[in-house]
Structure formats: C-alpha cells, structure tokens
From Swiss-Prot:
Protein family membership: Belongs to the class-II pyridoxal-phosphate-dependent aminotransferase family.
Its job: Aminotransferase that catalyzes the conversion of aromatic amino acids and 2-oxoglutarate into corresponding aromatic oxo acids and L-glutamate.
InterPro entries per UniProt: Aminotrans_II_pyridoxalP_BS (IPR001917), Aminotransferase_I/II_large (IPR004839), ArAT (IPR024892), HisP_aminotrans (IPR005861), HistidinolP_aminotransfase (IPR050106), PyrdxlP-dep_Trfase (IPR015424), PyrdxlP-dep_Trfase_major (IPR015421), PyrdxlP-dep_Trfase_small (IPR015422)
Cofactor: pyridoxal 5'-phosphate
Name assigned to this protein: Aromatic amino acid aminotransferase
Keyword Endoplasmic reticulum applies: no
Length: 361
C-alpha cells in the first residue's frame, strides 16, 4: 500500500540549483570568487574542536554581534531581540511564510523573482499572488493594488533575483507606508552589499518605524559563506519570537555561527571586496550592451539577459563553450559576475553567439 502524502506536493517543483560542471566556468549560482579571510578561517578551525557538541540553539553570540553590526549601519539601534538567525535567508523566508500564511491566505511578490517563493507559499497551503514586473523591476503600485483582505505577507526582493534591479529607497519607504499595518512586509536583501549609486535603503530603520517590516540578509553572497548556510532577519521582537518558534533546532551549525561572528568583526575588509565585483559588473554590463544585448542596470553580483525565446540556445551554446549560466524558463539568463578572466571568457562567447544569431536572421 502506498503511503498517503499531501496532494499539493504532486505539483511542487523540486529546486534546481545552478549546475556545477567539472572544468567549466560556473556563472550560475552568484557565488563570490573570494575565499574566507584568514581570521574567518581561524574561527572556523577553532570551532571544529567542539563539533562533538550541539551548537548554541539560540545563536545568542551571533545575535548580539549582528545587533551591533546592524546598529552601526543604520540610523536606528537594535538589540539581540530584534535578530533571528537561520540556515540561510531562504530558511528564514520559509519561516516567515509559516508564521503568517495558511490555507485561504495570500502572499504577494513580484514575478519573476526568487524561484523558491512560490513553492514555499504552496507548501504552507496559501496562494501565491505573482505581480508582473515592469521594466524588470517591481511594480509597487500594482503590488499595492493586489492587496486583499486575505493578504498576509508581501515580499520585496531588493535587489531582485534574477533581474538584478533595485527599488529606489524613497519608493520603498513610500510603499511600506502604504501597506496596511497588519500585513507583514519582508524585504529580502541577499545582495544588499552590492548596492551603489545612492540606492542603499536604510531598511533596518524601516523596521523601527513600521512594526510590520522585517529585513532578510545572508552571509552566503558578499561574505562568502555559502557552504556554511547562515542568514539573519531584522524585525520587531514579536516577529522575531514567532520566527524562533518555527526554527528547526540546531540547523545553524557551530562552524557557521563562528564564521558569521568573525565575518561581522571583519565586515569592512570583507565588504571592500565588493568594490572589485561592482567594477567588473560595470565592465561586463557595458561590453554586453556594446555587443547588442539588453542588460538592465544591475545592483547585484550578477547581470540579467532577457533573451526570452533565445534563452535555451544561449544556455546550450554556453555549455558547449564550457560556461555554465542560469536559465529562467523562456524569460532570460542570469550571469554571475566572477573573476576578470572568467568574465572575459563569458564576453568572448557572448559576442560570438550574438554575431552568429544576428547573421542567421
């Protein structure tokens, strides 16, 4: 007899990560090319001495360090009670859905955006309301218009993954002010460290001025800890307490906690590395545009190529050139900004590809 499983799971897509192909240039997962700093490596090594013990389930030292760090970057002050820690910001996003939405409820987000939002909402039994993007970024007015009495959560991915675009700080603040206060607004800032050109919002300050705002951040991108899985949320104490209630115990390892604390202590040195990525982002974007590609202005560590029906061919031909990029259906391709020599290889391929495509028309 077959076990009875939840019917909703039958149509649930399995998450497909960016491919890793031996010998190929991987531009599919938005990983940093920089390894951990020596101080972070030392903290990880020291933490291995006690891996026979369970990690601190409350992540108390991490929360204290993050509260100081976030306070130093914001116009507002925060304590550990304002911080939740999770197994990457993706886990915290799932926890947010769990504490806000169930059967009959609605969760709003722009689309296309982070591809795990829809299944996370579906697993909770809620309904995902996907609001189409305008010019590859969030249409905040349309998202507000989509609010109903069933809306429980709104997610704003900023910068947006995979389109790399950003909502301007003033527009984000006005949006938050316009959302009914009983609806939680989650600002997913996995790529916030790559923001430049006056686009950096003081989103933690929005947490202190609006009780329904929570900010998600991660150590997987700019901090280079993707393999250790640690992220955090900044929110009001009641929201944080609810997140902690649905946290799966011990999922943030002692190694991850030690690395996170050491990374925060070396934040200035680590984040200085993002300048090199931003410079390469500008160069790659400019050269792709010069070659004939449409490239929305990026504020992340990747660029978006809205190739539509040409997506599959681009990805297939890139793989033949030993370059792995990330396709998104028939919408487009996301390309990670990597080391200069890897970016050069991508540019050589892209020029050849678009020349061949244009010549074949």
């Amino acid at each position: 007899m077959t076990a009875r499983l939840r019917p909703v799971l039958a149509g649930l897509p399995v998450y497909v990560p960016g491919k890793t192909v031996p010998g190929a240039i991987k531009l599919a997962s938005n990983e940093t090319v920089f390894g951990p700093l020596p101080s972070v490596r030392a903290a990880i090594e020291h933490a291995t001495q006690s891996i026979n013990r369970y990690p601190d389930n409350g992540c108390l030292a991490v929360k204290a360090a993050l509260a100081r760090h976030v306070s130093s970057l914001s116009a507002a002050d925060f304590g550990p009670e304002h911080i939740a820690v999770g197994c990457g910001s993706v886990s915290l996003c799932q926890q947010l859905v769990q504490i806000t939405a169930s059967v009959g409820d609605e969760v709003i987000f722009g689309w296309r955006s982070f591809e795990l939002y829809p299944p996370q909402v579906q697993v909770a039994g809620a309904t995902a309301i996907q609001v189409p993007l305008t010019n590859h970024t969030f249409d905040l007015e349309a998202m507000l218009a989509a609010v109903t009495e069933r809306t429980r959560l709104i997610i704003v991915c900023n910068p947006n993954n995979p389109t790399s675009t950003v909502v301007q700080p003033e527009a984000l603040a006005e949006f938050v002010r316009s959302v009914p206060p009983h609806i939680l607004v989650a600002i997913d800032e996995a790529y916030v460290e790559y923001l430049r050109d006056g686009t950096v919002p003081d989103s933690p300050h929005l947490v202190r001025t609006h009780s329904n705002v929570v900010v998600l951040r991660t150590f997987s991108k700019a901090y280079g800890l993707a393999g250790l899985r640690v992220g955090y949320a900044v929110g009001q104490p009641d929201v944080i307490a609810a997140l902690d209630k649905v946290y799966v115990p011990f999922t943030v390892s002692s190694l991850a906690q030690a690395a996170a604390i050491a990374s925060v202590q070396a934040a200035d040195e680590l984040l200085a590395r993002t300048d090199a990525v931003v410079a390469e982002r500008g160069r790659v974007s400019a050269e792709l545009r010069a070659a004939g590609f449409t490239v929305p202005p990026s504020q992340a560590n990747f660029v978006w190529l809205p190739l539509e029906d040409r997506t599959t061919d681009f990805v297939t031909q890139a793989a033949k050139a030993h370059i792995v990029v990330r396709p998104y259906g028939a919408d487009g391709v996301r390309v990670t900004i990597a080391a200069p020599e890897e970016n050069d290889a991508l540019l050589r391929f892209a020029r050849c590809w678009i020349t061949h495509r244009d010549g074949a028309r």
